[in-house]
Curated annotation (Swiss-Prot):
Leading EC class: oxidoreductase
Entry EC no(s): 1.15.1.1
Official protein name in the record: Superoxide dismutase [Mn/Fe] 2
Gene (UniProt): sodM
Keyword set includes Iron: yes
Keywords: Iron, Manganese, Metal-binding, Oxidoreductase, Stress response
GO cellular component, one term: cytoplasm
Binding residues for Fe(3+): H27, H81, D161, H165
CC cofactor note: Binds 1 Mn(2+) or Fe(3+) ion per subunit.
Family: Belongs to the iron/manganese superoxide dismutase family.
Function as written in the Swiss-Prot or TrEMBL entry: Destroys superoxide anion radicals which are normally produced within the cells and which are toxic to biological systems. Catalyzes the dismutation of superoxide anion radicals into O2 and H2O2 by successive reduction and oxidation of the transition metal ion at the active site.
Pfam families referenced in this protein's UniProt entry, alphabetically: Sod_Fe_C (PF02777), Sod_Fe_N (PF00081)
Length: 199
């Protein structure tokens, strides 16, 4: 069964003014779609074609070596972006059990945001910043390229795309401005659902 590009759960312009329509169109229709196309070309006709993407990424060492790099890059790109679209929303409300536990662990939501933003804005090159559940505890981690915390046995619940294609049309080289804007469109309801399932 071929992997498919998911539809966005909102209109292309729904995240304005924080992420502009043109960026969303390029990011979803071009960049994400390319990962899906290349992933399908890699796994077509193999046993991986019938495996879940999460299992593939979590067990990357079991993927045949000839396909491993493509699954890591293109499978990671597909998984990461699919989750990224889900944790964004034009209706962002900072509430839920995950917010309570963030405050309990970091002291305040602002302290958490500051640490997350520092890791995101200082990440060299392209990659992702994540809030993960690791042995029942929340942790902020970064990964290069399209790598995913699942490979390290950690469950992602919130992620921030630090690739330039995610923000350059609107923010150019101002990654901190893009990071600040991100907090206005986080779908905390979805993040909390992922958190409760991962605990």
């Amino acid at each position: 069964m071929a992997f498919k590009l998911p539809n966005l759960p909102y209109a292309y312009d729904a995240l304005e003014p924080y992420i502009d329509q043109r960026t969303m169109e390029f990011h979803h229709d071009k960049h994400h779609n390319t990962y899906v196309t290349k992933l399908n070309a890699t796994v077509e006709g193999t046993e991986l074609e019938h495996q879940s993407l999460a299992d593939m990424i979590a067990n990357l060492d079991k993927v045949p070596e000839a396909m491993r790099m493509s699954v890591r890059n293109n499978g990671g790109g597909h998984f990461n972006h699919s989750l990224f679209w889900e944790i964004l929303s034009p209706n962002s409300e900072e509430k839920g059990g995950v917010i309570d536990d963030i405050k309990a662990q970091w002291g305040t939501l602002d302290e958490f945001k500051n640490e997350f933003a520092n890791k995101a804005t200082t990440l060299f090159g392209s990659g992702w910043t994540w809030l993960v559940v690791n042995n029942g505890k929340l942790e902020i981690v970064t990964t290069p390229n399209q790598d995913n915390p699942l490979t390290e046995g950690k469950t992602p619940i919130l992620l921030f795309d630090v690739w330039e294609h995610a923000y350059y049309l609107k923010y150019q080289n101002k990654r901190p401005d893009y990071m600040t804007a991100f907090w206005n469109i986080v779908n905390w309801k979805k993040v909390d659902e992922l958190y409760q399932a991962a605990k």
